[in-house]
């Protein structure tokens, strides 16, 4: 009788299917119970005033049409004389004031850059270009 072959054929095999089933059930229980766990922290929040509102910053809106005419509020300015005029006008505003530029799409690139350069030379750093959707 050959005992070596007998032991080789009868080796026990590890069945992991029940182990996987148990782990999946534990995972499902963990996923269901985790959102219900809440931690209660006592936080004393400062009280705010209901009447105080955030002040909206002043914005200078500069518009330039296809003929290179520049508009600020209801005033019209010429393209060539705009840097000098804007330097005088900018003294009324704080240099942290936001400046928005709305330029016609038919303008050439250099005219818009000229406008940006003029605004930067006046000391304004918060400049944005407005586009239409």
UniProtKB/Swiss-Prot annotation:
Its main location: membrane. It is found in: Cell inner membrane. Keywords: Cell inner membrane, Cell membrane, Membrane, Protein transport, Transmembrane, Transmembrane helix, Transport. It comes from the Bacteria. One of its GO terms (molecular function) is transmembrane transporter activity. GO terms for cellular component: plasma membrane. Residues 33-133 are periplasmic. GO terms for biological process: protein transport. The keyword Protein transport applies. Pfam families: ExbD. It is a single-pass type II membrane protein. Residues 1-15 are cytoplasmic. The chain crosses the membrane at residues 16-32. Belongs to the ExbD/TolR family. This is Putative biopolymer transport protein ExbD-like 1. It comes from Helicobacter pylori (strain J99 / ATCC 700824).
